[in-house]
C-alpha cells in the first residue's frame, strides 16, 4: 500500500475507532488536512443511519441514540480533551498546560461537560427526521474548525501531538492544505452554516490565543466535541437541501 494512501486511510484509525490501516503519527499529521472530508463524511453517514434507525424503531426519542454513537465512534478521546480543557479553564494561565495533561477530573470538567451535553441534548430532541444533510456538514465543519486552528496556531509548551501536527501542516504546501480544508468546510454547508463556521472559528481562535496561547491535542478534541452539536443545531434550522426536498414534495 502506498505511503499516501496509507496516511489518508490512517485518519480513520487515528480520529475514530473504525478499523483501517494504521500509519505513523507524522504521516497522519502530514495528511490531516484531508480528515475533515474523509472522516467527516464517514461519521456523518453513520450518524444519519443510527438516527434514522432509532426514529423508525422507537420514535422521535430514537434520535437520542446519536449522543452515545458519536462518542463511541470517537473512542471518547475528544470528550477527554473537552474535560481536560474545562479543568484548565479554572486555573491560572501558568498551570493550564499542566492541567491539560493531568488525569484528574474537577469541577471545570463537569461544568463544561454539562454545557456540551445540554447543547447536544437540545440538538437531538429537535431531530424529528434523519436527514443526511444535517450530519455531513456538522461532522465536516467540526473537524475543519479544529484542523484549521491546529495549522494556524503554534502548539502550547509540552504538547507533542500539537507540535507534530502543526509542523507537518506548516510545510511549503500549507496555503494549499489550508485552502482545501476551507473548501471541504463549505462543500455541504448552507450560507448560515458557513457564517456559523466563521464565527466559531474566530471564537475558538480567540479562546486558544488568550486562554492557552496556542493549540494542543486536548484543545483540538474539545473544539470538535463542543462545536459538533452547535453545527447540528444550526443545520437543523437552516439546511436548504432539506427544505428544497420538503418543498418539492408539495409540488403537483
From Swiss-Prot:
Give the protein's biological function.
Joins adenosylcobinamide-GDP and alpha-ribazole to generate adenosylcobalamin (Ado-cobalamin). Also synthesizes adenosylcobalamin 5'-phosphate from adenosylcobinamide-GDP and alpha-ribazole 5'-phosphate.
Query: What Gene Ontology terms for biological process does this UniProt record contain?
Result: cobalamin biosynthetic process
Q: Does the keyword Disulfide bond apply?
A: no
GO CC annotations on file: plasma membrane
EC code(s) of this entry: 2.7.8.26
Biological or metabolic pathway of the protein: Cofactor biosynthesis; adenosylcobalamin biosynthesis; adenosylcobalamin from cob(II)yrinate a,c-diamide: step 7/7
Q: Which GO terms describe its molecular function?
A: adenosylcobinamide-GDP ribazoletransferase activity; cobalamin 5'-phosphate synthase activity
The protein's name: Adenosylcobinamide-GDP ribazoletransferase
Cofactor requirement: Mg(2+)
Keyword Transmembrane listed? The answer is yes
